A protein has these predicted regions:
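Bacterial N-terminal signal peptides that target proteins for export
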Residues: 2-12
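Post-signal peptide N-terminal segment of mature Sec-exported envelope proteins
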Residues: 30-58
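Mature extracellular/secreted ectodomains of secretory-pathway proteins
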Residues: 65-192
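Compositionally biased, proline/threonine/alanine/serine-rich low-complexity intrinsically disordered stretches
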Residues: 186-210
């Protein structure tokens, strides 16, 4: 019994440290919800591949500019490509633009925005942060469908984002090879209204959910 007690005390102490650390991390995250949009301010430590990125604070972007960015996000099915579709319809972009504008102004140094938008077709989830000349959009889920683009086809591919004028994919270099990440868009901060007239997701049949 005398041997067990110190061991139990040590295990309890370690568990308490991890619990307190986890609570502190959660306490740092602030969440706001309105009109189906939920925004969380998260630490930059949660992002990957941003070591050489210089973030911009404060983030002052006009409502019209954010609306242009939302309307310029298009996606396409990988296995059975069809005409690209809007991630956000015009009505949704107009509704969300002022919310993103307000939220971005509230981002403090060392933070970025994680967002989810819940609609009748499912959940759309992503991250957004701003650098000197660009807005970075990382989309993980569209209408409830998780992004998958495995070149080895171990997991069935789903969709990819489609670039428009003023946008580029993020590229990662690992082991001498460069990889294009097609669910991450880097867009000029002063992106104009999109010229492409792709149909919105409200008028185009969506691909089956995985």
């Amino acid at each position: 019994m005398t041997v067990r007690h110190p061991l139990i005390a040590k295990i309890f102490s370690l568990s308490l440290i991890f619990f307190i650390g986890g609570c502190a991390l959660l306490k740092e995250e602030r969440t706001f919800s309105k009109s189906g949009l939920t925004i969380t301010f998260r630490s930059l430590n949660a992002l990957d591949d941003v070591q050489n990125i210089r973030f911009r604070y404060p983030i002052i972007v006009s409502e019209a500019n954010i609306r242009n960015h939302l309307l310029s996000l298009f996606y396409q099915d990988i296995v059975s490509p069809r005409q690209p579709r809007s991630v956000f319809s015009r009505s949704v972009a107009s509704k969300l633009a002022p919310l993103f504008k307000t939220a971005l102004k509230k981002v403090k140094p060392g933070k970025y925005l994680h967002f989810t938008y819940r609609a009748s077709r499912g959940l759309t989830e992503g991250q957004v942060f701003v650098t000197a000349k660009n807005i970075h959009w990382r989309i993980f889920k569209i209408n409830g469908v998780i992004y998958s683009n495995d070149p080895l086809r171990i997991r069935e591919p789903t969709w990819k984002l489609v670039r428009t004028h003023g946008q580029s994919y993020q590229r990662l270099r690992t082991g001498g090879f460069e990889k294009t990440i097609k669910n991450r868009i880097i867009a000029n901060i002063n992106l104009p209204f999109p010229k492409h007239k792709y149909p919105s997701r409200t008028t185009t049949k969506s691909f089956p959910r995985k």
